[in-house]
Amino acid sequence: MVPRAAGGRLYSDTMGRLTFILFLIYSLPVGMHHLLMDPEHGNATKFIQVLLTAFVSVPTLLTIFTITASLEIAGRLRGGRGLFGWIAALPWERPMVLATGLAFVMLGFGDFGGMINMGYDMNAMVHNTSWVTAHFHLIFGGSVVIMYFAIAYDIWPRLTGRDHPSLSLLRLQLWLWCIGMMVMTLPWHWLGLQGQWRRVANRHAPRGRLRGDNAGTQASAVAGRV
């Protein structure tokens, strides 16, 4: 969808299919690195999660390369010259292209935080702090959700047969989402380095309430996986 919106073509269909398969293999259980230092997880499990996090960085980089190469093709077809001239030649007024660029910005910060979470030593500095919260908000709430918006903008006219009343409003919404995520998460990173807690048990939980909370947590986990 992104290459088509930019006026180009996909750089490599094979690489796109390969990254999809690698993500299916490596990324489904990899979110446990957000809990890497929690004592209920054994050392073997933690080691496996570190490996999976390292492995999932490969299809992530392949995806970034493929999309960037596809956008470069589109930019050069539109007359872009020089090493970076193709970037300015892209149709940034189109919501799908703009969302991709903003997603890359948030993905860069989010991936950097993920690499910190991956390491035993560096993870010990930021575990259970707002750094971790900032990381996964940038990855999912930032780069993933903004692309959901762009896909919805692209699909809606095809489903309804009606054009959007204003592309300016769509672009404004994308910019506001990106700016809002950055304003929220960058201070979280800094506060995490200062030791701001992510989770804290600051009240007594009666046994009955605890059982109810556990049941709700397990139901949410099953529903989320489904």
Question: Which role does the model predict for each range below?
Answer:
Residues A74-W92:
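Membrane-interfacial, low-structure loops and terminal tails that flank and connect transmembrane helices
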